[in-house]
Structure formats: structure tokens, C-alpha cells
UniProtKB/Swiss-Prot annotation:
SS bond partners: none
Gene name, Swiss-Prot/TrEMBL: HBB
UniProt modified residues of type Phosphothreonine: 12
Lineage, opening ranks: Eukaryota, Metazoa, Chordata, Craniata, Vertebrata
Name assigned to this protein: Hemoglobin subunit beta
Protein task: Involved in oxygen transport from the lung to the various peripheral tissues.
Assembly, per entry: Heterotetramer of two alpha chains and two beta chains.
Organism: Mellivora capensis
Record-annotated Globin domain positions: 2-146
Binding site residues for heme b: 63, 92
Length: 146
């Protein structure tokens, strides 16, 4: 991902304030509520029968935290996202058969959640930088797909 020095600074400054537990669970939960067909990859998570069930599901929260911890690794390696996410790309492609479009959806949901949490601090410039990052991460995760 090509970011200017200002964009990198904006992304890392905001990310330093992110509560990974909270934002991760909310982002994954929103993905599952807004795009219900994504739930088929999470059969083992138990009750996903309603928005309240999804948002309160401890497995959704735990996996959301895991997802954002991986995203954090990507932020430390913006110049090598494909390398950073190579194993995860392989897992999601070969074993889990996740539609790579879902990575884009989750990235966009994450941007919405960040905007919700940070309000005025999430300026259009910060959003533009994050859109570049989530697009780069989605692209890296889709890399192993044929």
C-alpha cells in the first residue's frame, strides 16, 4: 500500500487509540448482521439468529479481536502486506474457501466502526488513508486465490 508520510502518521496515530477487543467484535458482528450470507463461515459460533445474538456472541467477539490483531500486524508491515498475510490468505482460500469479496466487505465495515468510535477525529483524510489500507489488506488476503 502506498501511503504518504502524513497518511501513515494519521493511520498509526488513530490505531494507537483503538480498543482491539471492542472494535474487532463490533466490526465482525456488523459484518455478520449487515451481510448475513457471511455467517455460513461461522457455523461453529453458535447462536447467530438475530442481530442481538450476533453482537452479544462471545465467539464473534473473540474472533473479531483475532482479526484486528492480524490487521495490527499489517499496519506494522504496510510495505509487505502480501508477505504478512500469505499464510492467512492460504488458509482462507484453500481450507476455509472464503469468498475474497468478504475481505473487502469487512474492511469497509471496519472503516464504518472506526468512524462511529472516533467521530470528528475520523476526518475525511483519515478515512481516505484507512480506505487505502483496508483495500491493501483485502488484496493481500485475496492473493492466494486462483
Amino acid at each position: 500500500v502506498h501511503l504518504t508520510a502524513e497518511e501513515k502518521a494519521a493511520v498509526t496515530a488513530l490505531w494507537g487509540k483503538v480498543n482491539v477487543d471492542e472494535v474487532g467484535g463490533e466490526a465482525l458482528g456488523r459484518l455478520l448482521v449487515v451481510y448475513p450470507w457471511t455467517q455460513r463461515f461461522f457455523d461453529s459460533f453458535g447462536d447467530l439468529s438475530s442481530p442481538d445474538a450476533v453482537m452479544g456472541n462471545p465467539k464473534v467477539k473473540a474472533h473479531g479481536k483475532k482479526v484486528l490483531n492480524s490487521f495490527s500486524e499489517g499496519l506494522k508491515n504496510l510495505d509487505n502486506l502480501k508477505g504478512t498475510f500469505a499464510k492467512l490468505s492460504e488458509l482462507h482460500c484453500d481450507k476455509l474457501h472464503v469468498d475474497p469479496e468478504n475481505f473487502k466487505l469487512l474492511g469497509n465495515v471496519l472503516v464504518c466502526v472506526l468512524a462511529h468510535h472516533f467521530g470528528k477525529e475520523f476526518t475525511p483524510q483519515v478515512q481516505a488513508a484507512y480506505q487505502k489500507v483496508v483495500a491493501g489488506v483485502a488484496n493481500a488476503l485475496a492473493h492466494k486465490y486462483h
